[in-house]
Amino acid sequence: MTFDYARRYMPEDQTGKTTVVGNMVAGMCAGVAESVLVLTPGENLKTRLIDDRAGARLYQSSTHAIRTIVTKDGASTFFRGVLPVTLKQSNSSMVRFTSYNQLAPMLQPTCGVSTSVVAGALAGVITVYCTMPFDNVKTQMQSLDGSRIYSSSWDCAKKLVVNGGPRRLWKGTTPRLLRLSVAGAIAFTLYEEVVRLTGFLVLPKVAAKAPKDAA
């Protein structure tokens, strides 16, 4: 919904379609909203729980983990690593939506009814390679020892490259590639089907206000 809402305010080309830049900006807006409101708190909690199960066993449940983290470290802990998450998610949404909206019209004559599946899968592949470094930095920053080892997201990225080479930033690409290509195919197919059946997601463009006549 954020993407469609933001796209209402984006410029159109001569055919009445949102421009490439418009799709990119709308995608980034969707990514920022998703990152700040949902992903960063959720990813911090998930990473803490995974690390805890492999180590000290400080948390009895998700609810207990939330209470303990807020009491001990403050609510701001849930937004630790918000910069790399936002960079990753805004870029991810920008690449995913822009790629899909560029690929779908090109593939339509060849793929027909399968266009959304193929375009969604390809958009997922492109997204993985463009955003994997942000994902690896985010994961390292949100680990239990992240705040002790790394002073910033940039410091984390530098240490990953120094210790493992540039390829370290793309570690774990293959499993994520499989996951996002399948997820992209399913998500965009469902999205297009919902739009086709209901039409409620396609919001009208905001018309420009005509200037008032001079008195």
UniProtKB/Swiss-Prot annotation:
Family annotation (InterPro entries): Mitochondrial_sb/sol_carrier (IPR018108), Mt_carrier_dom_sf (IPR023395), TXTP-like (IPR049563)
Keywords: Membrane, Mitochondrion, Mitochondrion inner membrane, Repeat, Transmembrane, Transmembrane helix, Transport
A GO CC annotation given for this chain: mitochondrial inner membrane
Lipid bilayer topology: Multi-pass membrane protein
Gene3D superfamilies xrefs: Mitochondrial carrier domain
Solcar repeat intervals: 18-106, 111-197
Pfam families in UniProt: Mito_carr
Subcellular location: Mitochondrion inner membrane
GO molecular function: citrate secondary active transmembrane transporter activity
Miscellaneous note of the record: Gene clusters encoding host-selective toxins (HSTs) are localized on conditionally dispensable chromosomes (CDCs), also called supernumerary chromosomes, where they are present in multiple copies. The CDCs are not essential for saprophytic growth but controls host-selective pathogenicity.
Protein name (Swiss-Prot/TrEMBL): Tricarboxylate transporter ALT9
